[in-house]
Every structure is written in C-alpha cells, then in structure tokens.
C-alpha cells in the first residue's frame, strides 16, 4: 500500500486519514441541522481550525466564527442547549457553509488563495444544485476577489446579499458594525432574525 496523500474533495489540500475523518464528521454535524428550505446560505471562506469555532460542533462552545454568526442572526445562547440553539438557526432557514470545508493545514497556509480559487467553482455548483437557497450571503472578505466576473456577480442561481459592494467580513477582526449590518441584511432578506 502506498503512503502517498491524495487531495481532499472538500478543500484541495493533501489529506491524511485524520483530515478526511474530521471533514466527514463536520459534514455530518452540519447536515443534521440543514434546513429543508434555505432562506440564507451564509458562505464563509475557510472552515475554522478549532471545533469550538465551528458552528455545528456538538461541543456548543460557539466561539470565534460560530459566536459571530449567532450574534448576527440574533440568536441568544443564554440558558439554551447546543441543540436548541442549532435548531433555532435551522428553523430560521439559515445554513452556514465554507468554500474550503477543512481548516488550512499550517504547511499549506500560503496557498489559501489558490485553494479558494480552485474550489470556488465546485462550491457554486453545490449552491445551485444542492443547497438551492433563496439568498447567498458571503461572510468572509477572502471571497471578495471571487464574487465578480467580467460580466458582474457570479451565478449562484439566487440573490447575493452584500455589504455594499463587498462580502460581510465576519473573520476574526469583525466589528460590531459589520455584525449589525449583517443582521439588518438578513432581516431585509426576509430571513427570520430577531433583535
């Protein structure tokens, strides 16, 4: 048997068995809370490195990206179980996904732009054919260079909701203004968001 690594289907990085197992676990966690009808698909660039920052993690820590997404959706975490929080997110027709479904391995960090560019067409196809949301809401500024073509915005098969002309930047440096703007955009997009 060969020890050669093959590219991961979810991110394009060379993948170990552990890498594949982690990707499949995260897909399973997300699929459990996938709405039947997706009002807004929140599209992030790169899956967080820590499970605590991954929205659908059963740990329910909701730090990092997960916490910012819940804050923007107006979902309180006070005195609620992890499942109750994720069910509320699901009932509102919200789904969070990533162009790169796996965290960037430290050895491949310099290639993140190339990996995003290579994986983006497959993500768009998945949005159009599988997710079929009413709205796509990009939530990472890393997606800005990928959202436009010579003829305009990329084809997602639905409306793209932007923060002006750019993606909402919910990366680690997100401001309260950005989170508030995203909440307003979700409300204006007729997604059930509570203040």
Residue ranges and their predicted role:
Residues 2-160, 165:
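A polyanion-binding, active-site-adjacent surface
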Residues 179-195:
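A polyampholytic, Gly/Pro-enriched intrinsically disordered region
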Residues 1, 166, 173, 191-195:
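Intrinsically disordered, charged low-complexity linkers and terminal tails
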Residues 169-180:
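Short, charged, surface-exposed secondary-structure boundary motifs
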